[in-house]
């Protein structure tokens, strides 16, 4: 069972009574056939539920009102099978607060050249019914997604499925609670921000709990539960000699397991699905949570270090989007560079907290090594390299008057040399279009040093996310040129300034 099993998407057909009962009967029959086929064959992440025809303003308004108040409804897919006068949709769309997609399709793929008549034309009017619907969306300044293609087309299936992921993610975000264990890393700017504005814009709440509250739960974990979890570690990971039974760091592993169990219990009891820690606020914990955080991220929790609640929330959101897709998604940080002509590279990592979902190794190494930052006992961590291939890094920043999402398309590569003295998980990548352009554009746009790294999601996914939440997006990819990028930043400043 996945999060998508908790939601459904309503399939709504727009028509009118102008064409008579026989046409409406055929419309209903076609709709039932299409919905059944999509649910059976399209591999959509969640179920489509066919709703009664929307043929009058009252019917359409009732559907939209019901969608708002049904917690299982993640959004609406609308098909204008015949012409559906768009003034009928105004009241419903005015109140609708769920994501909306127009499926611009028709029942037949090919025209029946020899038999086509006006009855056929009146029945199959998506071509101009969809345009009427599009006008009212534009007139109302209500942006909605549009997917064009025959309902049996695999590309259309993939695009609808991608939109569904965004719709479910948006509903999950409205209920997302972010727990901050301690506050921000002191004096850091980009990890701070307006939590009230974030809750208004995205729906997630951010609150702080004292580390002492967490410590109390950690200390309540039984030795039996700790030993059982360590048994799981031994089956899942390659344990270094120091972490094995009778190893000199075995106690550190036991303590890491206790912290993991305590953290998970605290998060579950509070209904949290994202959290932050900071190495400056660890009072009562014996070590900085590393292994615990890595494993919780792999289970779907959002996380970021140093109190960075925006990145923690974004990671949870992207984890939901990517559920069931190939590739992993993790907290990440641009750490250091490799400058070499035509082969500039970025080494990404963090002190400890990189999600094993992006690991190339089937069994990462579990080790305990010294960490100078934080002033605590040596922490346990998983060490691994990252899968290669196309990926993205994304950053959500607070500009005061708006949120900006930055996305850099990257290509992860194999580490050319071993890193025997680097005791943390890492990722190595080439930034698009090149490191100078990518880094300068990122810096000019105010991108954070913390990001969400993903092999599972792509630029189109993040564009949809930005559109669905009505926030600015700036893209750095192979098409980026700095003069045009700077111009776009200036234009965006004017555009969003007018919208205030």
UniProtKB/Swiss-Prot annotation:
Top-rank taxon: Bacteria
Pathway(s) it belongs to: Carbohydrate degradation; L-arabinose degradation via L-ribulose; D-xylulose 5-phosphate from L-arabinose (bacterial route): step 1/3
Root EC class: isomerase
HAMAP family in the record: Arabinose_Isome
Record's keyword annotation contains Mitochondrion: no
Record family assignment: Belongs to the arabinose isomerase family.
Cofactor list: Mn(2+)
Keyword list, A-Z: Arabinose catabolism, Carbohydrate metabolism, Isomerase, Manganese, Metal-binding
Residues reported to bind Mn(2+): 306, 333, 350, 450
GO cellular component assignments: cytosol
Protein name: L-arabinose isomerase
Reactions that this protein is recorded to catalyse: beta-L-arabinopyranose = L-ribulose
Gene3D superfamilies membership: 3.40.50.10940
Protein purpose: Catalyzes the conversion of L-arabinose to L-ribulose.
Pfam families recorded: AraA_central, AraA_N, Arabinose_Iso_C
GO biological process, one term: L-arabinose catabolic process to xylulose 5-phosphate
GO molecular function: L-arabinose isomerase activity; manganese ion binding
Cofactor note: Binds 1 Mn(2+) ion per subunit.
Cross-referenced InterPro entries: Ara_Isoase_C, AraA_central, AraA_N, AraA_N_sf, Fuc/Ara_isomerase_C, Fucose_isomerase_N/cen_sf, Lara_isomerase
SUPFAM superfamilies: FucI/AraA C-terminal domain-like (SSF50443), FucI/AraA N-terminal and middle domains (SSF53743)
This enzyme's EC code(s): 5.3.1.4
Assembly and binders: Homohexamer.
Organism encoding this protein: Escherichia coli O7:K1 (strain IAI39 / ExPEC)
């Amino acid at each position: 069972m996945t999060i998508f099993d908790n939601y459904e998407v309503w399939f709504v057909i727009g028509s009118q009574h102008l064409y008579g009962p026989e046409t409406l009967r055929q419309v209903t029959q076609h709709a039932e056939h299409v919905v059944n086929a999509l649910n059976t064959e399209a591999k959509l992440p969640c179920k489509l539920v066919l709703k009664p025809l929307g043929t009058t303003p009252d019917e359409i308004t009732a559907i939209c009102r019901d969608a708002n108040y049904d917690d299982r409804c993640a959004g609406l897919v609308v098909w204008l099978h015949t012409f559906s006068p768009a003034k009928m949709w105004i009241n419903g769309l005015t109140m609708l607060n769920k994501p909306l997609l127009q499926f611009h399709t028709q029942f037949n793929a090919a025209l029946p050249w020899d038999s086509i008549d006006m009855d056929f034309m009146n029945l199959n009017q998506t071509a101009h019914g969809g345009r009427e619907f599009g006008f009212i969306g534009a007139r109302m300044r209500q942006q909605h997604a549009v997917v064009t293609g025959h309902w049996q087309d695999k590309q259309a299936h993939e695009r609808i499925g991608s939109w569904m992921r965004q719709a479910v993610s948006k509903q999950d975000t409205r209920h997302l609670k972010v727990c901050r264990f301690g506050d921000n890393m002191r004096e850091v700017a980009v990890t701070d921000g307006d939590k009230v504005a974030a809750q208004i814009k995205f729906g997630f709440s951010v609150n702080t709990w004292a580390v002492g509250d967490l410590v109390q739960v950690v200390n309540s974990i039984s030795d039996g539960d700790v030993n059982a979890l360590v048994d799981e570690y031994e089956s899942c990971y390659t344990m270094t000699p120091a972490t094995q039974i009778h190893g000199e760091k075995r106690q550190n592993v036991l303590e890491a397991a206790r912290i993991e169990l305590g953290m998970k219990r605290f998060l579950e009891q509070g209904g949290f699905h994202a959290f932050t820690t900071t190495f400056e606020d660890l009072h009562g914990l014996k070590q900085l949570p590393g292994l615990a955080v890595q494993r919780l991220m792999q289970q779907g929790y959002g996380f970021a270090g140093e109190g960075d609640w925006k990145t923690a929330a974004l990671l949870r959101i992207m984890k939901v989007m990517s559920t069931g897709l190939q590739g992993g998604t993790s907290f990440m940080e641009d750490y250091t560079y490799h400058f070499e002509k035509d082969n500039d590279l970025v080494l990404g990592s963090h002190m400890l907290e990189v999600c094993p979902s992006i690991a190339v190794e089937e069994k990462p190494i579990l080790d305990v090594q010294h960490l100078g930052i934080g002033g605590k006992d040596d922490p346990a961590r998983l060490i691994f390299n990252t899968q290669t291939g196309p990926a993205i890094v994304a950053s959500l920043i607070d500009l005061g008057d708006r949120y900006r999402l930055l996305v850099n398309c990257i290509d992860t590569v194999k580490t050319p040399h071993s890193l025997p003295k680097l005791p943390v998980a890492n990722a190595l990548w080439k930034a698009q279009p090149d490191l100078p352009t990518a880094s300068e554009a990122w810096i000019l746009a105010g991108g954070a040093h913390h990001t969400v790294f993903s092999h599972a999601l792509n630029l189109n996914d993040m564009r949809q996310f930005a559109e669905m939440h009505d926030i600015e997006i700036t893209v750095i990819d192979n098409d980026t040129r700095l003069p045009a990028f700077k111009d776009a930043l200036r234009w965006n400043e004017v555009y969003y300034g007018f919208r205030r």
